[in-house]
């Protein structure tokens, strides 16, 4: 026969008055809230205050960084707008070049830049060739004088940019001149620009152009002298 627990005389029923709180809790630090269902929620005031402080701190920092980010984004947008306005007013002043020549000339300038990189690459002139050794015998491949000039450090630095500038100056001369003028006036220091023009005048105006003019005068004088001698010779021979 099964046992009937309700018939036990020694059964003990504990008290159910009020909530059972551990002795470790201090009731003055715990707030109680009763739900409509009759359940009670216990909340530690210390933990609630601590989490509230953390939440306020994180929220405060978030708004600070968000405001700073929005400010930087606005400043960057204003700077970009200023650059666009400056370029439109001082560089891209020729409508025909801007609408018809800017894109193709930029593509050709990019090709000129990489052409300069190829021409100044040591590998393309045999410096790294396996035949560039004395063991190759009659097959020894030595770089030419032109290759040594084009692969020098100044050429490797300047040649790509010189070719790029040459293409742009020939295809879009107005835009190129405006770019150089804007660079000299608003970007580079005035002392550097003055020194650059001085060196340019010494090398080009006082050097190359004067030498070219002198050679032209000498050649012209020689031609005129030669033509005069031929005329005198013909007059003498023909008894004119």
Curated annotation (Swiss-Prot):
Residue stretches spanning the membrane: 101-119, 157-176
Keyword annotations: Membrane, Mitochondrion, Mitochondrion inner membrane, Transmembrane, Transmembrane helix
Residue ranges that the UniProt entry lists as topological domain Mitochondrial intermembrane: 1-100, 177-240
Subcellular location: Mitochondrion inner membrane
Recorded topology in the membrane: Multi-pass membrane protein
Record topology, Mitochondrial matrix segments: 120-156
Origin: domain of life: Eukaryota
GO CC annotation, single: mitochondrial inner membrane
Subunit structure of this chain's protein: Component of the mitochondrial contact site and cristae organizing system (MICOS) complex.
Family: Belongs to the apolipoprotein O/MICOS complex subunit Mic27 family.
Functional description taken from the UniProt entry: Component of the MICOS complex, a large protein complex of the mitochondrial inner membrane that plays crucial roles in the maintenance of crista junctions, inner membrane architecture, and formation of contact sites to the outer membrane.
Descriptive protein name: MICOS complex subunit MIC27
Organism taxonomic ancestry: Eukaryota, Fungi, Dikarya, Ascomycota, Saccharomycotina
């Amino acid at each position: 026969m099964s046992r009937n627990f309700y018939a036990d005389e020694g059964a003990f029923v504990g008290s159910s008055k009020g909530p059972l709180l551990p002795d470790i809790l201090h009731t003055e630090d715990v707030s109680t809230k009763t739900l409509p269902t009759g359940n009670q929620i216990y909340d530690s005031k210390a933990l609630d205050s601590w989490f509230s402080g953390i939440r306020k701190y994180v929220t405060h920092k978030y708004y600070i960084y968000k405001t700073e980010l929005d400010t930087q984004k606005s400043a960057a947008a204003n700077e970009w707008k200023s650059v666009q306005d400056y370029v439109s007013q001082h560089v891209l002043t020729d409508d025909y070049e801007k609408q018809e020549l800017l894109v193709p000339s930029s593509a050709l300038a990019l090709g000129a830049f990489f052409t300069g990189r190829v021409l100044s690459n040591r590998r393309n002139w045999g410096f790294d060739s396996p035949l560039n050794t004395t063991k190759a015998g009659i097959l020894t491949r030595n770089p030419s004088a032109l290759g040594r000039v084009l692969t020098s450090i100044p050429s490797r630095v300047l040649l790509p940019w010189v070719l790029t500038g040459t293409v742009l100056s020939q295809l879009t001369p107005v835009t190129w001149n405006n770019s150089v003028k804007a660079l000299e006036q608003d970007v580079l220091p005035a002392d550097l620009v003055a020194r650059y023009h001085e060196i340019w005048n010494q090398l080009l105006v006082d050097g190359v152009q004067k030498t070219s003019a002198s050679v032209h005068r000498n050649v012209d004088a020689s031609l005129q002298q030669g033509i005069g001698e031929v005329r005198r010779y013909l007059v003498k021979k023909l008894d004119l």
